[in-house]
Amino acid sequence: MAVALNIADLAEHAIDAVPDRVAVICGDEQLTYAQLEDKANRLAHHLIDQGVQKDDKVGLYCRNRIEIVIAMLGIVKAGAILVNVNFRYVEGELRYLFDNSDMVALVHERRYADRVANVLPDTPHVRTILVVEDGSDQDYRRYGGVEFYSAIAAGSPERDFGERSADAIYLLYTGGTTGFPKGVMWRHEDIYRVLFGGTDFATGEFVKDEYDLAKAAAANPPMIRYPIPPMIHGATQSATWMALFSGQTTVLAPEFNADEVWRTIHKHKVNLLFFTGDAMARPLVDALVKGNDYDLSSLFLLASTAALFSPSIKEKLLELLPNRVITDSIGSSETGFGGTSVVAAGQAHGGGPRVRIDHRTVVLDDDGNEVKPGSGMRGVIAKKGNIPVGYYKDEKKTAETFRTINGVRYAIPGDYAQVEEDGTVTMLGRGSVSINSGGEKVYPEEVEAALKGHPDVFDALVVGVPDPRYGQQVAAVVQARPGCRPSLAELDSFVRSEIAGYKVPRSLWFVDEVKRSPAGKPDYRWAKEQTEARPADDVHAGHVTSGG
């Protein structure tokens, strides 16, 4: 009897096909598929024994490491729903996420125990807490935390979880339009089709049989995949699940270090490298330019999976690593994979963020009609077919993003684009307002709210300014209260208690009055012009920003 397209089932097919193959490597540690199965089963049973029920939410608050893969698989085996927790979040953001997700259990690294201890009194529904040792000494027993391996040791290693459903929910938390995280709800079958390997991205056709990937795994040696970004990103979750379903090997590292990346590729003979645009590509190039004795002959694909990276960096990578393929992929937590641009040695490629979209992705104008190639019209990227159910506990935002137009249901998260004459699509950005800093989305309204909490700030707008490494950096245009002129260092210290560090402004412009519409709506075009007209009045130490 066919098994539903459930993530746990798909992983178990590969486990059965290649039990002795290495599934995951991190540093000097590694697990075979059979060992991963044993530990994930034990975790699943432990969660169930602690009262975690089907569709309960379990947070995962860790950097990349072996235990994060055990936890991902164990959570879905238990029938629970994984909640990805950004380890950069400060306490206010954690409190919101724990509460909004209705989290009942948490797996976290010990280094975050103090933050967790401060948040738990306001989130009493988080009852079961497993702590992964990481060499730090923060006290987790004060709130009932239990060491990860001690907790799962008593769990059953058996795979006896009953039937599963393709309609089970997979939750991807992403920043909302106000900056607050929103949980995007996917059916397991749908996210498998668009993000986790259930579609041949070259042809756009579905993988026909749920056992096909596992059968191919048994018949072929494994590819070695190395996703660099943290697992909090859907892109790295995607790369990891794809590898698990197809019996491949995933290499992880807890931190990004360019030299260590190349050493790891050399050591483990990595075939596919995944990263996030220029923020990672530039240091990787710099490390290669310095010269090395690494054997990188195994590497044939370099893929940017969360932020487009510049043509100059592609050119340099191809120069340093000839005969490789480089790809840019577009997509989002709301759409999954949407399209790609591919560049290999000797191939022509344009200078803009241009991709070829798949046949389930379109660009729609304001009237809901498809934008014609070469028309020069701007439209929004819209995805049909396998798309999310909606946002968790947010009917209003669900109705805004997931719309039915001419009888077709689309996911329209707000990414603007135009269609070129050859059918490729040039990306213009999310509402032309959000800031993409090294692959991290920053939404202006959240930063503005934090800034305006400072007693010396009357009003503020936040925009992105160009940055050679990160693509963009966060800049603030501030109207101070009369007689006040807060320094960037003061504002930095103040807002860090409200927002994660990567959202904090790196440059500051003062104006007599922030320009808004009569209805109070912000004029971001005007704010951007202020940053381009003259040098910043104050910049973060070590970061130089000038007009133009």
Swiss-Prot record:
Q: Enzyme class, one word?
A: ligase
Write out the ranges of the annotated region (Disordered).
520-548
The family database entries (InterPro entries) matched by this protein are listed as: AMP-bd_C, AMP-bd_C_sf, AMP-binding_CS, AMP-dep_synth/lig_dom, ANL_N_sf, ATP-dep_AMP-bd_enzyme
Write out the GO MF terms: ATP binding; decanoate-CoA ligase activity; long-chain fatty acid-CoA ligase activity
Any idea which UniProt keywords this protein has? ATP-binding, Cholesterol metabolism, Fatty acid metabolism, Ligase, Lipid metabolism, Nucleotide-binding, Steroid metabolism, Sterol metabolism
Give the PROSITE patterns listed for this entry: AMP_BINDING
Pathway, per UniProt?
Answer: Lipid metabolism; fatty acid biosynthesis; Steroid metabolism; cholesterol metabolism
One GO cellular component term: peptidoglycan-based cell wall
Biased composition (Basic and acidic residues) is annotated at: 520-541
Question: Is Lipid metabolism tagged as a keyword?
Answer: yes
Query: NAD as a keyword?
Result: no
EC numbers: 6.2.1.2, 6.2.1.3, 6.2.1.42
The domain of life for this entry's organism is: Bacteria
Q: What does this protein do?
A: Catalyzes the activation of medium/long-chain fatty acids as acyl-coenzyme A (acyl-CoA), which are then transferred to the multifunctional polyketide synthase (PKS) type III for further chain extension. Catalyzes the ATP-dependent CoA thioesterification of the sterol 3-oxocholest-4-en-26-oate to yield 3-oxocholest-4-en-26-oyl-CoA. It can also use 3beta-hydroxy-5-cholesten-26-oate.
Q: What's this protein's family per the entry?
A: Belongs to the ATP-dependent AMP-binding enzyme family.
For this entry, the protein name equals Medium/long-chain-fatty-acid--CoA/3-oxocholest-4-en-26-oate--CoA ligase
Q: Which organism is it from?
A: Mycobacterium tuberculosis (strain ATCC 25618 / H37Rv)
